[in-house]
Design a protein with these regions (language model features):
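Short active-site oxyanion
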Residues: 17-20, 42, 60-63
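Hydrophobic beta-strand segments of well-ordered beta-sheets in folded domains
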Residues: 16-22, 82-83, 118-122
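A donor-sugar binding/catalytic signature common to diverse glycosyltransferases
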Residues: 48-97
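Flexible, charged surface loops at secondary-structure boundaries
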Residues: 12-16, 36-38, 56-60
Length: 176
């Protein structure tokens, strides 16, 4: 989506010398063409990371933009502020998923910040035009401590649940 460039530009406007680590592929190719047009931004393209190293990669960053549901889950577990770039699905089902995720993630936030969080997802996922993106990013960065605390709280909650594999084994053993 071309919206990623606009979002990165706005994030770079809020962060001094922002470093964006991008995994090789079409988005990295597009951003390499834009890198001289985005002030305060440095881009580092890296090869695909093995799954067992992906959590470490996510955890090494202050904020992440992830693609897909598996990456979303991993980003939630490492406790970093995130934006989810969902894969399109039939019948627009991804809009319902984005909306439900944003409602869950921002529960208890002030209404304007909830709306900004939803809107950045709608913009990135092509459900909303990019007008107002500067305002949306500004609201999110003005409330970055809330965003960080929320990310850490969700990570703690998920980590307390334990390993899905072990929970399945425990469940199965209880049935015996």
């Amino acid at each position: 989506t071309p919206m990623i460039e606009s979002i990165i530009k706005e994030i770079a406007d809020h962060v001094y010398d922002a470093l964006f680590t991008v995994i090789e592929g079409p988005i990295a190719d597009r951003l390499s063409q834009e890198k001289n047009k985005i002030e305060n931004a440095l881009f580092k393209t890296i090869p695909f990371v093995p799954q067992n190293n992906f959590n470490d990669l996510l955890g090494a960053h202050d904020m992440v933009i992830v693609r897909g549901e598996d990456s979303l889950t991993r980003a939630l577990v490492v406790g970093r502020p995130l934006i989810w770039h969902i894969y399109p699905q039939e019948n627009g089902a991804h809009l319902d998923k984005i909306t439900a995720f944003c409602d869950w993630y921002t529960k208890g936030w002030p209404e304007d910040v909830q709306k900004a969080f939803l809107n950045i997802h709608l913009i990135l996922n092509d459900f909303m035009p990019q007008e107002g993106i500067k305002y949306v990013i500004n609201i999110l960065f003005l409330n970055k401590n809330l965003w960080i605390e929320t990310a850490q709280r969700h990570a703690h909650t998920l980590q307390k649940k334990g390993s899905a594999a072990q929970n399945l084994v425990d469940f199965w053993q209880k049935l015996r």
